[in-house]
Amino acid sequence: REWVILDTLHRESLHTLLEEFGCKGVSEERVEHLNRMWHRLRPWSDSVEGLERLKKRFILATLSNGNVALLVNMAKFSSLPWDTILGAEVSRSFKPMPHTYLTTASMLGLAPEECMMVAAHNSDLQVASGLGFRTSFVCRPEEYGPKQRTDLEAEDDYDLIADDFI
């Protein structure tokens, strides 16, 4: 399949779920509204303050599978202070493909070892570390909901390990 943005994949998944659960007659306008909920996610309570502190000394960029419009809207909605939005749409590849990580560093004019990947997902950090990025694990025990079974702790010797951004 040709590469598509995450909004498209979310919409396809939403249509599949609506069909699977027998939700008939949902208007395309409603589907679009539901699909754009991703654009209006609220950040963790410590994120904005922590990112603002980091921004005083470091370049803050996304390395997300989200498309640019999704991430810009999310940033505006939640006041996330990114310096730039990078990741999957820019590299036209999704994590965990190495190209996604390396393109992000390259777009910033940096070598991987000059960057720090911060994530709540061990798999993200393991790939980044293998490519030479510095890494920071931030534990988010409800990232996947109250019954989360993975990413409850750092699974490797990352450069930094924290419970929050503050």
Label the predicted regions.
Residues 57-58, 132:
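Glycine-centered short loops/turns at secondary-structure junctions
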Residues 48, 52, 63-166:
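Asp-based, Mg2+/Mn2+-dependent phosphohydrolase catalytic module
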Residues 16, 20, 53, 57, ...:
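Solvent-exposed, charged/polar functional surfaces in cytosolic regulatory/catalytic domains
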